[in-house]
């Protein structure tokens, strides 16, 4: 029972991830987090962030 539940959960997670990757929401989310860190280190805010890595910062 426990093994079956684990397999079902894994299939659901894989399905959700594949849906997100096809819409590239996950990639964009990761890129935006990296952008926030990079811009934050420069004392700026994120202006544009898109996947694949396209990041532009703006002042203040």
Curated annotation (Swiss-Prot):
Signal peptide: 1-28
Intrachain disulfide bonds: 32-49, 35-55, 39-57
Keyword Transmembrane: no
Modified residues (Lysine amide): 59
GO molecular function: ion channel inhibitor activity; potassium channel regulator activity; toxin activity
A Pfam family recorded for this sequence: Toxin_6
Assigned keywords, A-Z: Amidation, Disulfide bond, Ion channel impairing toxin, Neurotoxin, Potassium channel impairing toxin, Secreted, Signal, Toxin
Subcellular location field: Secreted
Tissue specificity statement from the Swiss-Prot or TrEMBL entry: Expressed by the venom gland.
Origin: domain of life: Eukaryota
An annotated GO cellular component: extracellular region
Described function: Inhibits potassium channels.
Name the UniProt record assigns to this protein: Putative potassium channel blocker TXKS1
Organism, scientific name: Olivierus martensii
Upper taxonomic lineage: Eukaryota, Metazoa, Ecdysozoa, Arthropoda, Chelicerata
């Amino acid at each position: 029972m426990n093994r079956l539940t684990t397999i079902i959960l894994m299939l659901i997670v894989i399905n959700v991830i594949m849906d997100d990757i096809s819409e590239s929401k996950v990639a964009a989310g990761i890129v935006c987090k990296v952008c926030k860190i990079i811009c934050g280190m420069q004392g700026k805010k994120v202006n544009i962030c898109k996947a694949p890595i396209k990041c532009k910062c703006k002042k203040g």
